Curated annotation (Swiss-Prot):
Involved in cell wall synthesis where it is required for glycosylation. Involved in cell cycle progression through cell-size checkpoint. Its main location: cytoplasm. CDD domains: LbH_M1P_guanylylT_C, M1P_guanylylT_B_like_N. Its EC number is 2.7.7.13. PROSITE patterns: HEXAPEP_TRANSFERASES. The gene is mpg1. This is Mannose-1-phosphate guanyltransferase.
Length: 364
């Protein structure tokens, strides 16, 4: 089987992290985001993966070579010379996606969930039509494009309603699809939208179905959602009794959902959790309080610091008695001085912060 992952451009929404690494290589749950997807696709029998990108960073090429060997898949880049939207990249990769009649998966690189690729492929085969989109239920459908089914048909899609004013349903497009190669005939090689142009055309022919996603789902393309997605992912691991989580019997674990890389060092009298990810070679001093945060590789948190709703980038250091909260993001190699308060700062790489940041701001 084949798959195309829509990676796109420079990941500006996730800056300052994406100033250091391309978004697919930023670690989510201590593994590059793209690895969650590659692993799930390979497990479902996918052998060819295409990454649709606007630019091809060399660092990605070498990282993905490693995954090719590890998961026995072929990973190719399809590089757009101009941004082609969400449908154009499929046409650009037609030579790979249409090399046989088997259907192919398409997914957005920002989506984290329990990927249901195997079940999705079986469902798609059963109904025998042209396309299936994965949908997820949301509490506030008015913010999204909602999927409406045909009367008396649980999966065949009748129409899409963008940001509905009155309730028409609560299922939204989850950014994952399985499509027959015939769909490519509907797409021109130009900037074009799969959601607004291709899918409505397939719906008019009665050929598009939806598949309900069980479990959690999050688009983690910006820091606030990256943190929420981390909470959902850790909760999902807890439900599965995953060995990736620190046992609640550890003296520092407070409230569960804590992932600690084996190489990290944790001081005395710390309270860590709920919903914390600690990366490789992280050093945490004594009496530190961490909740709902991500600490990336080689970062350092000194004694008695207090960190909540924050992403601490690689090689960064947080001083003694410092306090970080309110979706603060430290880029690579940022230093926060002792006793400094940061309230929602987005701090670019290699900066040193010696003064409080009382209101959310970008520090360049």
């Amino acid at each position: 089987m084949k798959a195309l992952i829509l990676v796109g451009g420079f990941g500006t929404r996730l800056r300052p992290l994406t100033l250091t690494l391309p978004k697919p290589l930023v670690e989510f749950g201590n593994r590059p985001m793209i690895l969650h997807q590659v692993e799930s696709l390979a497990a479902a029998g996918v052998t060819d993966i295409v990454l649709a990108v606007n630019y091809r960073p060399d660092v990605m090429v070498s990282a993905l070579k490693k995954y090719e060997e590890q998961y026995n898949v072929k990973i190719e880049f399809s590089v757009e010379t101009e941004p082609l939207g969400t449908a154009g990249p499929l046409k650009l990769a037609e030579s790979i996606l249409a090399k046989d009649d088997s259907p192919f998966f398409v997914l957005n690189s920002d989506v984290i969930c329990d990927y249901p690729f195997q079940q999705l492929a079986e469902f798609h085969k059963r109904h025998g039509d042209e396309g299936t989109i994965v949908v997820t239920k949301v509490d506030e459908p008015s913010k999204y494009g909602v999927v409406v089914h045909k009367p008396n048909h649980p999966s065949r899609i009748d129409r899409f309603v963008e940001k509905p004013v009155e309730f028409v349903g609560n299922r939204i497009n989850a950014g994952m699809y399985i499509l027959n190669p015939s769909v490519l005939k509907r797409i021109e090689l130009r900037p074009t939208s799969i959601e607004q142009e291709t899918f409505p055309a397939i719906v008019r022919d009665g050929q598009l179905h939806s598949f309900d996603l069980e479990g959690f789902w999050m688009d983690v393309g910006q820091p606030k959602d990256f943190l929420t997605g981390t909470c959902l992912y850790l909760t999902s691991l807890t439900k599965r009794n995953s060995k990736l989580l620190a046992p609640n019997s550890e003296p520092y674990v407070y409230g569960g959902n804590v992932m600690v890389d084996p190489t990290a060092k944790i001081g005395k009298n710390c309270r860590i959790g709920p919903n914390v990810v600690i990366g490789p070679n992280v050093v945490i001093g004594d009496g530190v309080r961490l909740q709902r945060c991500v600490l990336m590789e080689n970062s350092k948190v000194k004694d008695h610091a207090w960190i909540k709703s924050t992403i601490v980038g690689w090689n960064s250091s947080v001083g003694r008695w410092a306090r970080l909260e309110n979706v603060t993001v430290l880029g690579d190699d940022v230093t926060i001085a002792d006793e400094v308060y940061v309230n929602g700062g987005s701090i670019l790489p290699h900066k040193s912060i010696k003064q409080n940041i009382d209101v959310p701001a970008i520090i360049m």
